[in-house]
Amino acid sequence: MEAAPSRFMFLLFLLTCELAAEVAAEVEKSSDGPGAAQEPTWLTDVPAAMEFIAATEVAVIGFFQDLEIPAVPILHSMVQKFPGVSFGISTDSEVLTHYNITGNTICLFRLVDNEQLNLEDEDIESIDATKLSRFIEINSLHMVTEYNPVTVIGLFNSVIQIHLLLIMNKASPEYEENMHRYQKAAKLFQGKILFILVDSGMKENGKVISFFKLKESQLPALAIYQTLDDEWDTLPTAEVSVEHVQNFCDGFLSGKLLKENRESEGKTPKVEL
């Protein structure tokens, strides 16, 4: 199948026009519950830092040689804005060396693709709350990442080029149970496939559903997509099970693709979404 450059970043193009408003809305979300952490965790040695990173899906750590720079209080201010992210700080020289840090740096660590993303040098010098919020929001990919105009950028920046989408209405009675099984399946493909949730109850996600030629009556459904060559496949499913997800993903990874999708792609003119 011939890849279409105009569709190579199809998810990104679908929602780019809405990005600015969504970013502003997302970064305002915070957790005010009594259990919310108030301060980053101090990481005093390498084992503590390694354990801290390994224990969470997304960790943001400030590696500082100077605690008087503006980036330090800005990092502190992020803790309540992102309750799904673990925050830490370290000034220990051995810790900085272990993570190849040579100056004041804020790093985001992701379990899903084992990535370390750094803000350093000029980025740290010019950092403000809005910039740091955007950096965290874009790059906070979890074992299952909800699709929106912000996370789509991080999804396509990942080294993992195969995306599995569960397209389902979050308001449905079956959502919680299906999501639990979907999350279990995601662990089986860590490092190979990014697992994504698309809420079909949101009007703005309609273009994603139509891209995969799915009808409302076929939902919930799984859709798998390879960013490198635009190949994709779908599997309408009344119930999400670990076995169904595993078989579907294994089939795609082994090169199996529904014949009707290949034929449809060959007949359909390539259009920019």
From Swiss-Prot:
SUPFAM superfamilies (UniProt xref): Thioredoxin-like
Ranges of residues in domain Thioredoxin: 39-152
Main location: endoplasmic reticulum
Glycosylation sites: 100
Keywords associated with the record: Endoplasmic reticulum, Glycoprotein, Signal, Unfolded protein response
Induction comment from the UniProt entry of this chain: Induced by ER stress.
Cited Pfam families: Thioredoxin_6
Impact after mutating residue 168 to W: Decreases somatostatin-14 binding
InterPro entries in alphabetical order: Thioredoxin-like_sf (IPR036249)
Compartments, as annotated in UniProt: Endoplasmic reticulum lumen
Stretches for region PDIA3-binding site: 230-233
Motif (Prevents secretion from ER): 270-273
Signal peptide start-end: 1-25
Presence of keyword Signal: yes
GO cellular component terms attached to this protein's record: endoplasmic reticulum; endoplasmic reticulum lumen
A biological process term (GO) from this entry: response to unfolded protein
Chain's role: Specifically binds unfolded proteins and may recruit protein disulfide isomerase PDIA3 to unfolded substrates. Binds protein substrates via a hydrophobic pocket in the C-terminal domain. May play a role in the unfolded stress response.
Protein family membership: Belongs to the protein disulfide isomerase family.
The protein's assembly and partners: Interacts with PDIA3.
Protein name stated in the entry: Endoplasmic reticulum resident protein 27
